[in-house]
Amino acid sequence: MPSSTLLELAPNTHSKCKFETRNRSSSSSSGCSSSSTELYDLAAAHAALISRQQQILNQGIPIIPEHQLAAAAVAHHHHQLHPSVQHQLVAGHHHHHLPQVAHHPAILPRSDVIQQPSHFALHQHLQNLVQQQQQQQALHHHQQLVGDMALVSHTHPAAVGSTTCYEKNPQKQQQVPQIPTQPQVAHVSSNAILAAAQPFYQPPVQDSQPDRPIGYGAFGVVWSVTDPRSGKRVALKKMPNVFQNLASCKRVFREIKMLSSFRHDNVLSLLDILQPANPSFFQEFTSWHLTPSIHHQRLISHIKPICLFFVLPLVSLLCAHMYVCMWWHGTALLEGRKETITYVLTELMQSDLHKIIVSPQTLTIDHVKVFVYQILRGLKYLHTANILHRDIKPGNLLVNSNCILKICDFGLARTWDSRDRLNMTHEVVTQYYRAPELLMGARRYTGAVDIWSVGCIFAELLQRKILFQAAGPIEQLQMIIDLLGTPSQEAMKYACEGAKNHVLRAGPRAPNLQSLYRLSQQTTDDAVDLLVKLLKFNPDERISVEEALSHPYLEEGRLRFHSCMCSCCYTKANVPSRIFSQELDPKHESPFDPKWEKDMSRLSMFELREKMYQFVMDRPALYGVALCINPQSAAYKNFASSSVAQASELPPSPQAW
């Protein structure tokens, strides 16, 4: 009987790997990628925040900030803990209520939190668990119970990560949405205490939802699958034809490198990379290309004086010999093509902003402010990392029912240097959200192209339809001019000459900015002011992401987000009010060096493939256990045949001026 899931544990799964216990309830199985996702009432949630905080204080549950949780995770790398402790560390990313892990093997409670007797019992019990850690027997039957159920699998213990994997079960009745803030801390903390008291390991409860496709694009196919290590739903992205050409190899390596560095509430992060089934594939694949060149060189050096009549038969025999050797060593050509697919696991969200916009549900002005604030907040994180997204659109903005938004899809993203504007392709950004300089063939552009896209999305949220919906690039440019007026020569300094002449031939046209007030009945002066600054024709005059975040229109959105939605702010048991982070809109901790892009451009296909392979193999697997594709899964046939978007499904190409 074929198993139901696409992912399974890798064949070389370590027998002593430990997995965290996962206690699931009906309220924890939330959301799927569907257009019916209902958003929380932000105003009601904000009004109930104070009473909920008081409830937390009465229960005496410790809450710690994010940076202490990070320190706890670092300490965990040095000390193997009981699976229930691992569960607390993983869950701590979303619920800041767990005891701090010291660098000593013992689990020490925080001194600044009033502790209940249950916490002292937990402390003593965890100490006993750590002392008995080396004496526990490995659960060798776990792979037999779980391995056949999942699409991916794991190998050996390593680092512990945190996930944000939510998906609705369409077979279950939808729960009334509640913002997952401090009131849920009591429930999760009690579950953690009960889990720590269990003397025996319990395997994670598998999600019963079937694996299914949830989206595809020009560079990949995304499936919703179950991670057998945790039982959670995650997104599996399949990127085919990685080594088809040098440009494709660079794009995939760039995307994986970026996703691995993201740690932000509003940017999708990488959970894991599936290691190749054949670890020596890259070396064997390289030999396919190198060996013929060596044989050909030797052949040519020996057959120069020989008649051409003998050349073709010898070459044919040589090629036949190569393929026989590859078959003899178990490396078939078709198998090599199969291995050019790269699989990555990311967080799974419930829906995206496009589905929310076209749905019949109500979008209040509070929702608009919170969404726009989060888009700009995530964009600041990317721009400070020297990354241009170059495809900001509602479909690439994932949303959960709690209104958390994450920027995704970095297939077109690349690093850049603000001090040295290099030529880049203008075939980026979906047409409806493409900045005018890109429409006019500019090759040197900045992060202002992302800012323009945010302005288009802002207007789309207000009026619930696309702002500039044109059939082609020329009509798109004309719609922009109809709104903003004819640009000056200075505003078109990055455009190509053909585009400039086209605009000037049309004659001058006055701006029509007053039409922005008709986007919605709730459009205010502040909203129009921010829109106008986001939609400046001249990219040098367009507002920066930092300036946009400080705009008065987004003050309420910032307050709502950091009152009950973010992970950077926290609440202490002995402090009645929420403690806000000093950096509400954080920057990237380690920006990409612009030299990295230049160095990568000098690499050959073989060198780049070697670097990519080394990066994948050196990266520790999530939970310390690697995964692989399960060919026995019932969904494997459909998964293997799923392909990227065809040329006819893609947006029109930019105008060739």
Swiss-Prot record:
Q: What is its main location?
A: cytoplasm
Task: Please list the cofactors this protein needs.
Answer: Mg(2+)
Q: Give the family per the record.
A: Belongs to the protein kinase superfamily. Ser/Thr protein kinase family.
Name this polypeptide is given: Serine/threonine kinase NLK
Q: Where is the Protein kinase domain?
A: 208-554
Q: In which organism is this protein found? A: Caenorhabditis briggsae
What gene name does this entry carry? lit-1
Which InterPro entries does the record associate with it?
Kinase-like_dom_sf (IPR011009), MAP_kinase (IPR050117), Prot_kinase_dom (IPR000719), Protein_kinase_ATP_BS (IPR017441), Ser/Thr_kinase_AS (IPR008271)
**Record's subunit section:** Component of the beta-catenin-lit-1 complex (also called the lit-1/wrm-1 complex or the wrm-1/lit-1 kinase complex) at least composed of lit-1 and wrm-1. Interacts with wrm-1 (via N-terminus); the interaction is direct and activates lit-1 kinase activity which leads to the phosphorylation of pop-1. This promotes pop-1 interaction with par-5 and translocation of pop-1 from the nucleus to the cytoplasm. Interacts with pop-1 (when phosphorylated on 'Ser-125'); the interaction is dependent on the beta-catenin-lit-1 complex.
Its biological purpose is as follows:
Has a role in the Wnt signaling pathway controlling the asymmetry of cell divisions during embryogenesis. Operates in the AB and EMS cell lineages influencing cell specification. Required for body wall muscle development, endoderm development, pop-1 asymmetry and T-cell division asymmetry. Component of the beta-catenin-lit-1 complex which promotes the phosphorylation, down-regulation and subcellular relocation of pop-1. Regulates plp-1 nuclear localization in embryos. Plays a role in male tail tip morphogenesis.
Per the Swiss-Prot or TrEMBL record, the active site comprises 391 (proton acceptor)
Catalytic activity entry? L-seryl-[protein] + ATP = O-phospho-L-seryl-[protein] + ADP + H(+); L-threonyl-[protein] + ATP = O-phospho-L-threonyl-[protein] + ADP + H(+)
Gene Ontology cellular-component terms for this entry are: cell cortex; cytoplasm; nucleus
Q: Which EC number(s) are documented for this chain?
A: 2.7.11.24
Keyword entries, A-Z: ATP-binding, Cytoplasm, Developmental protein, Kinase, Magnesium, Metal-binding, Nucleotide-binding, Nucleus, Serine/threonine-protein kinase, Transferase, Wnt signaling pathway
Keyword Transferase assigned to the entry: answer is yes
